[in-house]
């Protein structure tokens, strides 16, 4: 059984990072809680959305698929390895990952309607 503990983040794809940052940080006053450049000019920025949740914006495109992470939600799970095993045992295709980053682990699947659903686990120091 997958143990979901919170909504980890929601993702919005942006085409102009500077314009998006001006809007989210300047206009809306959101505070940056993570700012990572995956590759030159390819950004993943998370804004504090209260509690363990964040709003992520990105212009990142996967080098394997030339597609950006699609808008979607990420579920924070307390049992990441078990969640990954449960998804695989159910025959659900992993569409992104599994990935290990400095602050977290994450993978994605498609729901029955083709929406991206991410499973996420923050590392203890995060």
Regions found by a protein language model. Name each.
Residues 2-5, 11-53:
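Core segments of cupin and vicinal oxygen chelate
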Residues 52-56, 113-116:
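Short, charged/polar, Gly/Pro-enriched secondary-structure boundary elements
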Residues 55, 66, 70, 119-125:
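Membrane-topology and secretion signals of cell-surface/extracellular proteins
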Residues 1-3, 6-15, 33, 45-48, 63-126:
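Vicinal oxygen chelate
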Residues 1, 61-64:
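Short, flexible, solvent-exposed loop/turn segments with mixed acidic/basic and small polar residues
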Residues 37-39, 63-65, 99-101:
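A short beta-turn/loop motif at secondary-structure boundaries
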